[in-house]
Amino acid sequence: MAGTEHLIEVPEDQDPWPLLFEIADATREGTWVLVGGLMVHAHAIRAGVAPSRTTRDVDLLLDIGASRVSDVAGPLQSMGFAPLHANSATPLHRFTRGEDVVDVMVEPGIRARWSRRSVLVAPAARQALDRRDRYVLQGTTKSVRIAVPDPLGAIVAKAAAYHVDQRDPGRHLEDLAVLMASGGGRRALGLERLARRDKQHLRPALDALIDEGHDAWSVLEFGDRLVAQRARRAIAEAVDQPTRSRGATGKM
Protein backbone atom coordinates (compact mmCIF):
# COMPACT_ATOMS: atom_id res chain seq x y z
CA MET A 1 0.00 0.00 0.00
CA ALA A 2 1.13 3.59 -0.60
CA GLY A 3 3.35 5.06 2.10
CA THR A 4 5.13 1.82 2.99
CA GLU A 5 8.92 1.77 3.27
CA HIS A 6 10.93 -1.13 1.84
CA LEU A 7 14.59 -2.05 2.10
CA ILE A 8 16.05 -3.91 -0.87
CA GLU A 9 19.59 -4.90 -1.75
CA VAL A 10 20.61 -3.87 -5.25
CA PRO A 11 23.77 -4.55 -7.30
CA GLU A 12 25.44 -1.17 -6.90
CA ASP A 13 28.08 -2.09 -9.51
CA GLN A 14 25.58 -3.25 -12.17
CA ASP A 15 24.19 -0.67 -14.62
CA PRO A 16 22.03 1.32 -14.35
CA TRP A 17 21.92 1.10 -10.53
CA PRO A 18 25.10 3.21 -10.08
CA LEU A 19 23.47 5.94 -12.16
CA LEU A 20 20.32 5.81 -10.04
CA PHE A 21 22.44 6.15 -6.88
CA GLU A 22 24.19 9.15 -8.45
CA ILE A 23 20.88 10.82 -9.33
CA ALA A 24 19.44 10.18 -5.87
CA ASP A 25 22.50 11.81 -4.30
CA ALA A 26 22.32 14.82 -6.62
CA THR A 27 18.58 15.59 -6.34
CA ARG A 28 16.29 16.45 -3.46
CA GLU A 29 14.14 13.62 -2.15
CA GLY A 30 10.52 13.90 -3.26
CA THR A 31 11.21 15.60 -6.59
CA TRP A 32 10.70 12.43 -8.64
CA VAL A 33 9.34 8.89 -8.61
CA LEU A 34 11.09 5.98 -10.29
CA VAL A 35 9.11 4.45 -13.18
CA GLY A 36 9.89 2.33 -16.25
CA GLY A 37 12.03 -0.78 -16.37
CA LEU A 38 14.03 -0.07 -13.22
CA MET A 39 10.76 0.35 -11.29
CA VAL A 40 9.88 -3.19 -12.39
CA HIS A 41 13.29 -4.40 -11.18
CA ALA A 42 12.79 -2.76 -7.77
CA HIS A 43 9.44 -4.54 -7.31
CA ALA A 44 10.90 -7.84 -8.51
CA ILE A 45 13.82 -7.63 -6.06
CA ARG A 46 11.45 -6.78 -3.20
CA ALA A 47 9.28 -9.81 -3.98
CA GLY A 48 12.08 -12.24 -4.90
CA VAL A 49 10.90 -12.53 -8.50
CA ALA A 50 13.36 -12.72 -11.40
CA PRO A 51 13.09 -9.59 -13.61
CA SER A 52 12.05 -10.28 -17.19
CA ARG A 53 14.72 -8.20 -18.91
CA THR A 54 17.72 -5.98 -18.45
CA THR A 55 17.27 -2.23 -18.64
CA ARG A 56 19.80 0.51 -19.40
CA ASP A 57 17.76 3.66 -18.83
CA VAL A 58 16.59 5.46 -15.71
CA ASP A 59 13.02 6.78 -16.04
CA LEU A 60 11.93 9.57 -13.69
CA LEU A 61 8.39 10.88 -13.22
CA LEU A 62 8.76 14.43 -11.93
CA ASP A 63 6.52 15.60 -9.09
CA ILE A 64 5.85 19.13 -10.28
CA GLY A 65 3.51 19.72 -7.34
CA ALA A 66 6.50 19.42 -5.00
CA SER A 67 9.25 20.79 -7.21
CA ARG A 68 10.20 22.34 -10.54
CA VAL A 69 11.66 20.72 -13.64
CA SER A 70 14.91 22.55 -12.94
CA ASP A 71 15.20 20.75 -9.58
CA VAL A 72 16.00 17.61 -11.59
CA ALA A 73 17.23 18.98 -14.93
CA GLY A 74 19.74 21.26 -13.20
CA PRO A 75 21.47 18.49 -11.23
CA LEU A 76 21.48 16.27 -14.32
CA GLN A 77 23.33 18.96 -16.25
CA SER A 78 25.76 19.37 -13.35
CA MET A 79 26.41 15.62 -13.62
CA GLY A 80 27.38 16.08 -17.28
CA PHE A 81 24.07 15.20 -18.92
CA ALA A 82 22.72 17.14 -21.90
CA PRO A 83 19.13 17.20 -23.24
CA LEU A 84 18.57 15.32 -26.49
CA HIS A 85 17.15 17.27 -29.47
CA ALA A 86 17.33 20.59 -27.68
CA ASN A 87 14.80 22.64 -29.60
CA SER A 88 11.49 24.18 -28.59
CA ALA A 89 9.45 22.10 -31.06
CA THR A 90 9.98 18.75 -29.30
CA PRO A 91 9.07 17.93 -25.69
CA LEU A 92 11.92 17.52 -23.26
CA HIS A 93 12.25 13.80 -22.60
CA ARG A 94 15.79 12.47 -22.65
CA PHE A 95 19.11 13.43 -21.13
CA THR A 96 22.27 11.62 -22.20
CA ARG A 97 25.85 11.38 -20.94
CA GLY A 98 27.81 9.04 -23.12
CA GLU A 99 25.91 5.75 -22.89
CA ASP A 100 23.97 6.85 -19.80
CA VAL A 101 20.32 7.73 -20.47
CA VAL A 102 17.80 9.42 -18.17
CA ASP A 103 14.22 9.96 -19.35
CA VAL A 104 12.01 12.49 -17.58
CA MET A 105 8.24 12.98 -17.79
CA VAL A 106 5.35 14.70 -16.05
CA GLU A 107 1.66 14.05 -15.46
CA PRO A 108 -1.00 15.23 -17.96
CA GLY A 109 -2.44 18.67 -17.37
CA ILE A 110 0.78 20.11 -15.93
CA ARG A 111 2.21 23.07 -17.83
CA ALA A 112 5.79 22.19 -17.05
CA ARG A 113 8.53 23.78 -19.14
CA TRP A 114 12.29 23.84 -19.05
CA SER A 115 14.52 25.93 -21.27
CA ARG A 116 11.42 26.99 -23.28
CA ARG A 117 10.47 23.37 -23.93
CA SER A 118 7.46 21.43 -22.74
CA VAL A 119 8.09 18.13 -20.95
CA LEU A 120 6.90 14.73 -22.15
CA VAL A 121 3.60 13.63 -20.59
CA ALA A 122 3.17 10.14 -19.11
CA PRO A 123 -0.27 8.48 -18.87
CA ALA A 124 -1.49 7.40 -15.42
CA ALA A 125 1.18 9.57 -13.85
CA ARG A 126 -1.02 11.20 -11.20
CA GLN A 127 -2.00 7.89 -9.63
CA ALA A 128 1.65 6.76 -9.68
CA LEU A 129 2.63 9.89 -7.75
CA ASP A 130 -0.22 9.46 -5.29
CA ARG A 131 0.52 5.78 -4.71
CA ARG A 132 4.20 6.06 -3.93
CA ASP A 133 6.18 3.94 -1.51
CA ARG A 134 9.63 4.69 -0.13
CA TYR A 135 12.49 2.37 -1.02
CA VAL A 136 15.86 2.25 0.67
CA LEU A 137 18.28 0.87 -1.91
CA GLN A 138 21.15 -0.84 -0.14
CA GLY A 139 24.30 -1.27 -2.17
CA THR A 140 27.62 -2.78 -1.13
CA THR A 141 29.08 0.52 0.09
CA LYS A 142 26.17 2.96 0.45
CA SER A 143 22.40 3.36 0.44
CA VAL A 144 19.94 5.87 -0.99
CA ARG A 145 16.25 6.53 -0.39
CA ILE A 146 13.89 7.01 -3.35
CA ALA A 147 10.17 6.95 -4.20
CA VAL A 148 8.62 4.12 -6.24
CA PRO A 149 4.92 3.59 -7.08
CA ASP A 150 3.35 0.91 -4.89
CA PRO A 151 2.40 -2.39 -6.59
CA LEU A 152 -1.02 -1.16 -7.74
CA GLY A 153 0.39 2.15 -8.94
CA ALA A 154 3.13 0.36 -10.86
CA ILE A 155 0.68 -2.05 -12.52
CA VAL A 156 -1.67 0.76 -13.59
CA ALA A 157 1.25 2.82 -14.91
CA LYS A 158 2.63 -0.10 -16.93
CA ALA A 159 -0.82 -0.98 -18.29
CA ALA A 160 -1.24 2.64 -19.40
CA ALA A 161 2.17 2.54 -21.09
CA TYR A 162 1.12 -0.60 -22.97
CA HIS A 163 -2.06 1.14 -24.14
CA VAL A 164 -0.36 4.27 -25.53
CA ASP A 165 3.07 2.96 -26.56
CA GLN A 166 2.78 0.23 -29.19
CA ARG A 167 6.41 0.35 -30.32
CA ASP A 168 7.22 -2.72 -28.20
CA PRO A 169 3.99 -3.99 -26.62
CA GLY A 170 5.52 -7.33 -25.68
CA ARG A 171 8.01 -5.60 -23.40
CA HIS A 172 5.24 -3.85 -21.47
CA LEU A 173 3.28 -7.09 -21.11
CA GLU A 174 6.35 -8.93 -19.82
CA ASP A 175 6.88 -6.13 -17.29
CA LEU A 176 3.24 -6.43 -16.25
CA ALA A 177 3.64 -10.17 -15.74
CA VAL A 178 6.58 -9.52 -13.40
CA LEU A 179 4.68 -6.78 -11.53
CA MET A 180 1.65 -9.04 -11.08
CA ALA A 181 3.90 -11.78 -9.72
CA SER A 182 5.40 -9.23 -7.32
CA GLY A 183 2.16 -7.59 -6.19
CA GLY A 184 1.25 -9.79 -3.24
CA GLY A 185 -2.33 -10.67 -4.20
CA ARG A 186 -5.74 -9.03 -4.00
CA ARG A 187 -5.50 -7.72 -0.44
CA ALA A 188 -1.92 -6.45 -0.71
CA LEU A 189 -2.73 -4.66 -3.97
CA GLY A 190 -5.67 -2.84 -2.41
CA LEU A 191 -7.88 -3.31 -5.46
CA GLU A 192 -10.74 -1.46 -3.77
CA ARG A 193 -8.74 1.70 -4.54
CA LEU A 194 -9.21 1.34 -8.29
CA ALA A 195 -10.80 4.42 -9.81
CA ARG A 196 -12.64 4.67 -13.12
CA ARG A 197 -9.59 6.02 -14.95
CA ASP A 198 -7.41 3.25 -13.52
CA LYS A 199 -9.80 0.68 -14.97
CA GLN A 200 -9.67 2.35 -18.37
CA HIS A 201 -5.89 2.08 -18.33
CA LEU A 202 -5.96 -1.55 -17.20
CA ARG A 203 -8.51 -3.12 -19.56
CA PRO A 204 -6.45 -3.36 -22.78
CA ALA A 205 -3.50 -5.01 -21.04
CA LEU A 206 -5.71 -7.35 -19.03
CA ASP A 207 -7.43 -8.42 -22.24
CA ALA A 208 -4.06 -9.01 -23.93
CA LEU A 209 -2.95 -11.27 -21.08
CA ILE A 210 -6.17 -13.29 -20.77
CA ASP A 211 -4.53 -16.16 -22.67
CA GLU A 212 -2.42 -17.98 -20.08
CA GLY A 213 -0.30 -19.30 -22.94
CA HIS A 214 0.73 -15.77 -23.96
CA ASP A 215 4.47 -15.37 -24.46
CA ALA A 216 4.62 -12.68 -21.76
CA TRP A 217 3.89 -15.25 -19.06
CA SER A 218 6.86 -17.36 -20.14
CA VAL A 219 9.35 -14.90 -18.61
CA LEU A 220 8.27 -16.12 -15.16
CA GLU A 221 9.19 -19.29 -13.35
CA PHE A 222 6.28 -21.70 -12.94
CA GLY A 223 5.34 -20.75 -9.38
CA ASP A 224 5.62 -17.02 -10.05
CA ARG A 225 3.55 -17.46 -13.20
CA LEU A 226 0.69 -19.01 -11.23
CA VAL A 227 0.80 -16.14 -8.73
CA ALA A 228 0.83 -13.55 -11.53
CA GLN A 229 -2.06 -15.15 -13.42
CA ARG A 230 -4.10 -15.32 -10.24
CA ALA A 231 -3.38 -11.61 -9.70
CA ARG A 232 -4.48 -10.83 -13.27
CA ARG A 233 -7.79 -12.58 -12.65
CA ALA A 234 -8.30 -10.70 -9.37
CA ILE A 235 -7.54 -7.37 -11.04
CA ALA A 236 -9.89 -8.18 -13.93
CA GLU A 237 -12.68 -9.01 -11.47
CA ALA A 238 -12.08 -5.72 -9.65
CA VAL A 239 -12.11 -3.80 -12.94
CA ASP A 240 -15.54 -5.26 -13.72
CA GLN A 241 -16.96 -4.14 -10.36
CA PRO A 242 -18.80 -0.78 -10.10
CA THR A 243 -16.43 2.03 -9.16
CA ARG A 244 -16.94 3.70 -5.82
CA SER A 245 -17.69 7.38 -6.21
CA ARG A 246 -15.07 8.33 -3.63
CA GLY A 247 -12.25 6.65 -5.54
CA ALA A 248 -10.34 9.69 -6.76
CA THR A 249 -6.72 8.55 -6.74
CA GLY A 250 -6.79 7.51 -10.38
CA LYS A 251 -7.74 10.86 -11.88
CA MET A 252 -5.26 12.37 -14.26
State the predicted function of each range.
Residues M1-M252:
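Compositionally biased terminal segments of proteins
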